[in-house]
Amino acid sequence: MRNIRVEKVQSRTEVNDFIELPKRIYADNKYYVPDLDLDIRENLTKVQAFIAYNDVGDAVGRVAAFINQKANVKWGQKAVRFSQIDFINDFDVAKALMDAVEEWGHEQGMDKVMGPMGQYDFDKEGMLVEGFDQLSSIIEIYNASYYPALIEKLGYTKAADWVQTRMEIPKVVPKMYSRVAKYARETLGLKVKKLTTREITKGGYGKRIFHLLNEAYSPLFGFTEMPPQQVEQYTNQYVRLVDKRLLTIIENEKEEIVGTCVTMGSLSQALRKSRGRLFPFGWLHLIGSLKWKHEDTVQLLLIAVKPDYQGYGVSALMFEDLIPIYNELGFKWAEAGPQLEYNHKELSQWRPLNPEIIKRRRCYTKAIK
């Protein structure tokens, strides 16, 4: 395939093609989980999106490009980021898409490309390079195995890798967690607190949780602090939907939040059934999975410990609280979100659960010439 036309996404047809393309590519793939259409539409207002067509007018590729100015200032770089990249198994299509990103980035004064990355660290990041036979989730990117091969053929190299682990939920809390949790409770005066929706949305706990996340994640690769308006949106759209039994915070004696663990029952099969559409009936699948008949896996969405308290049993306190709840609700497996491969301190917290690395994803980079 040679005659590839890349357009900036502007018309209603182009928007719809951008949304529907991955569903067509992965129509017969049982591991792919779609994004919600409404989330994609909203995101298109914040990025420069491109759609690729073949010589008969069929959509064959897509990508979004954007510049995170705060990240560039923080990390001392001039990078254009890309995300939401999908394409058929054709080198010319991949090249046309990335040429468009590189050209647009150059026009904006950037000197390198990085991605797939989100606008914030809580967005989906990293191209899958291992684990193509594992079910995806609401918090991660899925792509076919030919993606990294074609991207690397274009001269892109590894900037960072994230790994994801899966653990079988034990019937009883591991002794290591119990022992360390006891120390945190009795010596440091730390305590578990469960929240109501009102406390999260109206009582300020939502903002306090994201303040902790911003503080704990600040040193991590590519991270930029989430602004207040985005915190408000995430709190209202997502955190309020979480079963509050699956959300734990740890407070010190001054009632300051020093740790948080936001988890949620997997929505993967519900999203597959809905095909990413809330209407007319897609919302029934999602609400049903959240409220009534959940899947057997719990997603560990966001885990953070205040830097001053890291290594003092905060994580153990959270798991001591959550493991019995997971068992009570019938969950069998826990799957962590992407974690940087060199973040050994964070990865070591799973050791008592005999973790298995099941996925690896990569951020690529390339200089713009």
Regions found by a protein language model. Name each.
Residues D55, F66-K70, I85-F87, G118-Y120, ...:
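An acidic- and aromatic-residue-enriched active-site/binding cleft used to recognize and process polar
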Residues M167-P170, T365-K369:
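Short beta-strand-to-coil "C-cap" segments at the C-terminal boundary of structured domains/repeats
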Residues P22-D55, V63-V73, I200-I303:
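A conserved beta-strand-loop-helix scaffold within acyl/acetyltransferase catalytic domains
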Residues M1-Y32:
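Generic start-of-chain signal for non-secretory N-termini
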Residues R2-I4, I141-G222:
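Acyltransferase donor/substrate-recognition loop-hinge adjacent to the catalytic core
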